Amino acid sequence: MTFKPLDPVTKYANDVVKGKILAGNDIILASQRHLDDLERQDTNAFNFHFDVELLHKFLAFAALVPDPDDGVPKPLMPWQIFILGSIIAWRNNKTGGKRFRRAIISIARAQGKTYLASIIAAYDFFVQSYQKSNQDILLSANTTDQTKKLFNYTKATVELMLNST
């Protein structure tokens, strides 16, 4: 079934599955899963839904997140929107919580993994943890040096956002 691309995540998934966007097998499978799950989301047997309204709110927030290297927000590419939207917009029907609580993002060096992680961390810190106390955000990487880089990058992102208000 082909869905009318109401949102950029579904449009990207459609384009990947149709072969309009060249992608590896894992992205093709993730795109097909997204489309299959959209079909199942209104059935009793499937406990999740794709929240398009939340996706648009998240993308509006992401458009404000500055890159600490120059202090300017970077426009997200369609593949980045697909990854972030898949993580953020799939929700549990009963709890409203995230369907995916962990994500492994494997991208070549210098392609923006740290920026994507900082967007998610900033969103969790500013939006999803709003009016909650004692919230923890876990940042991890393969090495201590990578974890420090991610922490410092995310810290700089949050500081830029706090100082811009």
Task: Walk through the language-model features, giving the residues of each.
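Phosphate/NTP-binding elements of NTP-utilizing enzymes
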Residues: T2-T165
